[in-house]
């Protein structure tokens, strides 16, 4: 399973990139708004740091405007993937953009059937939201498992991006469920690095070394 980072914070992306684990980035209007910067400027800088799919979301709600925005965003860099919300107008836009050779990531997926429709419309990626489903008492990982099984059964090559990831267990569950990608906040990536026994082991090694050599 590939690891993307879910942020528009350039410094977080730069730090995570240095770990050598990033294969892509997902952004959304809320994340970019937090940065208080021009969207094109932010996306260009992100593309200069990570050589992989960079999801940039349209703001429009009508197909024609989604397509127009998508085409403009795609001009920023060859790695841009256009993020489209799951809705009727969104599916229409995905079909048009796919016919133009522009990759899309259909977001706000909350059911396997939504994922199937998005894939058949031509989406390159679908993004089921784990955390938000958990919030309403529906285990988010269940739909990731169902989508992965359905895509494998029918030979669908659309990639699954586990999104709305809140903790390391979401990442582990996604990997075991067959998700192709998990897009993860920076703080969760850092949590994945840590384990109490790793820290204790490092401390013990240093103590033993210093004791042996009287340091």
From Swiss-Prot:
This is Probable transaldolase. One of its GO terms (molecular function) is aldehyde-lyase activity. Transaldolase is important for the balance of metabolites in the pentose-phosphate pathway. It catalyses: D-sedoheptulose 7-phosphate + D-glyceraldehyde 3-phosphate = D-erythrose 4-phosphate + beta-D-fructose 6-phosphate. The gene is tal. NCBIfam families: fsa_talC_mipB. Pathway: Carbohydrate degradation; pentose phosphate pathway; D-glyceraldehyde 3-phosphate and beta-D-fructose 6-phosphate from D-ribose 5-phosphate and D-xylulose 5-phosphate (non-oxidative stage): step 2/3. It is an enzyme of class 2 (transferase). Belongs to the transaldolase family. Type 3B subfamily. The keyword Transferase applies. PANTHER family: TRANSALDOLASE. GO terms for cellular component: cytoplasm. It is found in: Cytoplasm. It comes from the Bacteria. Its EC number is 2.2.1.2. SUPFAM superfamilies: Aldolase. Keywords: Cytoplasm, Pentose shunt, Schiff base, Transferase. GO terms for biological process: carbohydrate metabolic process; pentose-phosphate shunt. It comes from Clostridium perfringens (strain SM101 / Type A). The active site is at residue 83.
């Amino acid at each position: 399973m590939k690891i993307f980072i879910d942020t528009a914070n350039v410094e977080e992306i730069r730090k995570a990139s240095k770990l050598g684990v990033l294969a892509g980035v997902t952004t959304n209007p809320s994340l970019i708004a937090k940065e208080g910067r021009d969207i094109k400027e932010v996306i260009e800088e992100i593309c200069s740091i990570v050589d992989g799919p960079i999801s940039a979301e349209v703001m429009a709600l009508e197909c024609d405007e989604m397509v127009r925005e998508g085409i403009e965003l795609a001009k920023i860099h060859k790695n841009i993937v256009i993020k489209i919300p799951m809705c009727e107008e969104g599916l229409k836009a995905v079909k048009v953009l796919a016919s133009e050779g522009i990759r899309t990531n259909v977001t706000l997926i909350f059911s396997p059937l939504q994922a199937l429709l998005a894939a058949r419309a031509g989406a390159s990626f679908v993004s089921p939201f784990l955390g938000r489903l958990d919030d309403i008492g529906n285990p988010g990982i269940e739909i990731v498992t169902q989508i992965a099984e359905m895509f494998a059964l029918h030979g669908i090559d659309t990639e699954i991006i586990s999104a709305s990831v809140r903790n390391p267990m979401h990442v582990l569950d996604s990997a075991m469920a067959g998700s192709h990608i998990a897009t993860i906040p920076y703080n969760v990536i850092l949590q994945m690095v840590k384990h109490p026994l790793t820290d204790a082991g490092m401390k013990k090694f240093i103590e033993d070394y210093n004791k042996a050599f009287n340091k």
